[in-house]
């Protein structure tokens, strides 16, 4: 199974609880996602001026890019209450009803992993989002009756890493869909520099750059790497985190110059050496690495594709020449027909 303790996993880990102090508190402090942030500011200002609930918001993007942080900022900027839960936690319609009936006017309800809601819960959510009403069935059999409960006008903020798993009726009820993208190195430098300041740790510009370059475009990983590099700097009695300290620390932690760790290199090396660089189907890779398909598609591959090391083609996964150069291997000569014209068309074996 994918090791949840991977330093560069974008998924939330137990030690990320310390990130709360590093999180921006409002949109002006939030770095990156410029267009999404600007649009969100307009929608928030308009709702606040009209004294109305903000339209329902859907954040889509890989883990660790700030979906939860933005949801909290939305509530803070609106000056309303904030309740948070996740799709798997809402097991039955009654759980959702309890959450919704306790919301005050214009409050924000945040549902992480909203694509994992059960169909029965989704059915209850539709009228709640559209008409601010709950349609519940009370009792069973011939004695069962339908009850309508009026709700306060609230804002649902959903977050998902798998937009394709959302049902169309649910997706269509979000008036403000926002896609979050990986961050640039410059944006991550700003995040690392701010984080070091919050932690009271001096850092040089080249030290922040070294951490940012290896943070895989993800603020959550940048904060995690910063905390670990800070440990190395403290142990060495360094006055500040500079490039040399950061390079030594991240090398010791097996995070290479491109932000790849042992799992990433194992994935790339398996395709390169065992399958001639590909194409190879994702199910074959799942068996070869003893990893579930979801972990490969959601955790391992996105950053490798973003970096240009991997292509999803109609015939399967294919390493690029860039990947071979990074591994220090000679790229094989390949028929151009192996490359798909339009990327991924699903799993191919």
Swiss-Prot record:
UniProt-annotated binding residues for DNA: 293, 312, 317
One family name in Pfam for this protein: RuvB_N
One GO cellular component, as annotated: cytoplasm
Ranges where the record places region Large ATPase domain (RuvB-L): 1-183
Catalytic activity: ATP + H2O = ADP + phosphate + H(+)
Stretches assigned to coiled coil: none
Record-level GO BP terms: DNA recombination; DNA repair
Sites where the protein binds ATP: 22-23, 64, 67-69, 130-132, 173, 183, 220
Region (Small ATPAse domain (RuvB-S)): 184-254
Region (Head domain (RuvB-H)), start-end ranges: 257-349
EC number: 3.6.4.-
Assembly with partners or alone: Homohexamer. Forms an RuvA(8)-RuvB(12)-Holliday junction (HJ) complex. HJ DNA is sandwiched between 2 RuvA tetramers; dsDNA enters through RuvA and exits via RuvB. An RuvB hexamer assembles on each DNA strand where it exits the tetramer. Each RuvB hexamer is contacted by two RuvA subunits (via domain III) on 2 adjacent RuvB subunits; this complex drives branch migration. In the full resolvosome a probable DNA-RuvA(4)-RuvB(12)-RuvC(2) complex forms which resolves the HJ.
Notes on the domains: Has 3 domains, the large (RuvB-L) and small ATPase (RuvB-S) domains and the C-terminal head (RuvB-H) domain. The head domain binds DNA, while the ATPase domains jointly bind ATP, ADP or are empty depending on the state of the subunit in the translocation cycle. During a single DNA translocation step the structure of each domain remains the same, but their relative positions change.
Family from the record: Belongs to the RuvB family.
Function in brief: The RuvA-RuvB-RuvC complex processes Holliday junction (HJ) DNA during genetic recombination and DNA repair, while the RuvA-RuvB complex plays an important role in the rescue of blocked DNA replication forks via replication fork reversal (RFR). RuvA specifically binds to HJ cruciform DNA, conferring on it an open structure. The RuvB hexamer acts as an ATP-dependent pump, pulling dsDNA into and through the RuvAB complex. RuvB forms 2 homohexamers on either side of HJ DNA bound by 1 or 2 RuvA tetramers; 4 subunits per hexamer contact DNA at a time.
Name of this protein: Holliday junction branch migration complex subunit RuvB
Source organism of this protein record: Rhodopseudomonas palustris (strain ATCC BAA-98 / CGA009)
Lineage of producing organism: Bacteria, Pseudomonadati, Pseudomonadota, Alphaproteobacteria, Hyphomicrobiales
Underlying gene: ruvB
């Amino acid at each position: 199974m994918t090791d949840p303790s991977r330093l560069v996993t974008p998924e939330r880990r137990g030690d990320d609880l310390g990130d709360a102090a590093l999180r921006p508190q409002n949109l002006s402090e939030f770095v990156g996602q410029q267009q999404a942030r600007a649009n969100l500011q307009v929608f928030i200002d308009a709702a606040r001026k009209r004294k109305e609930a903000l339209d329902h918001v859907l954040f889509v993007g890989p883990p660790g890019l700030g979906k939860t942080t933005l949801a909290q900022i939305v509530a803070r900027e609106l000056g309303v209450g904030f309740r948070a839960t996740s799709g798997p936690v809402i097991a039955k319609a009654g759980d959702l009803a309890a959450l919704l009936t306790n919301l005050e006017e214009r409050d924000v309800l945040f549902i992480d992993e909203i694509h994992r809601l059960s169909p029965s819960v989704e059915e209850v959510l539709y009228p709640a989002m559209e008409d601010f009403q709950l349609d519940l069935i009370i009792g069973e059999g011939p004695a069962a009756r339908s009850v309508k409960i009026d709700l306060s006008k609230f804002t649902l903020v959903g977050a998902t890493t798998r937009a394709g798993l959302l049902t169309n009726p649910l997706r269509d009820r979000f008036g403000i869909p926002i896609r979050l993208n990986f961050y640039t190195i410059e944006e991550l430098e700003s995040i690392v520099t701010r984080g070091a300041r919050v932690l009271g740790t001096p850092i040089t510009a080249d030290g922040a750059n070294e951490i940012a370059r290896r943070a895989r475009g993800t603020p959550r990983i940048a904060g995690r790497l910063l905390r670990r590099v800070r440990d190395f700097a403290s142990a060495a009695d360094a006055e500040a985190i500079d490039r040399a300290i950061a390079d030594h620390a991240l090398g010791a932690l097996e995070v290479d110059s491109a932000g790849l760790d042992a799992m990433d290199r194992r994935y790339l090396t398996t395709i390169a050496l065992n399958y001639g660089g590909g194409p190879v189907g994702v199910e074959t890779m799942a068996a070869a690495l003893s990893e579930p398909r979801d972990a490969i598609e959601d955790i391992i591959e996105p950053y490798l594709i973003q970096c240009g090391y991997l292509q999803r083609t109609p015939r399967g996964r294919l390493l690029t020449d860039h990947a071979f150069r990074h591994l220090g291997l000679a790229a094989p000569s390949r028929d151009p027909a192996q490359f798909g014209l339009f990327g991924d068309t699903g799993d191919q074996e």
